[in-house]
Amino acid sequence: MTVTVAEFEIADSPDAWTRAGFTVDGDPVCRVGGARIRLVGRERGSGIVGWSLRGLPKSAGSADVDGIPTTHSAADPAQPASHANGATAIDHVVLMSPDLDRTVASLAAIGVAPRRERDAELGGRPIRQIFFRFGEVIVEVVGSPETASEGPSTLWGITYVVADIDATASFFGEHAGPVKDAVQRGRRITTLRHRDLGMSVRTAMISAIPER
């Protein structure tokens, strides 16, 4: 069975996400594409504090995934909501790893294999990006190709697909950076100044994959 993302838990208030143009249900849950984002409040800390996954093997038990709090889910995919900021789906989530080999092994243990990898630089230091597909969501694992350290992996940021990147940038105004070409050919991206909006998760918006 394919492992897919059912839900992210994020330690933010619903008001912050409403200000950012997301539609938030009463639970409070934000439905983006087939995934749910449950806003659990700052009492739980900050950032992405856990996730729920469908299709986990029974052998996974109740263990976390490389230190990330993980819950088994049997919930059906969410019915997508309409959002004023133009978000239509989650493109990818960034998972920061202190030990790439360990993280890849942890994901293999739940039945997820890498699709591709890419070497790059971040702040002048070499990094390796390893990409995994969890249904409609890509998980981009990022870490050093040269060193490994102790500690858990963390879910670091989310990039959303939007219907019209220029309209989205206009919606956010000064709260978004300039629209620029993305690494993926034919796509464009803008990064939010998320803290200005009261959000604790690093957030970007990207145009859809061009039709061929």
Each model region followed by its residue ranges:
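Glyoxalase I/VOC metalloenzyme domain signal
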Residues: 1-115, 133-212
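Beta-rich nucleic-acid/ligand-interaction surfaces
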Residues: 120-131
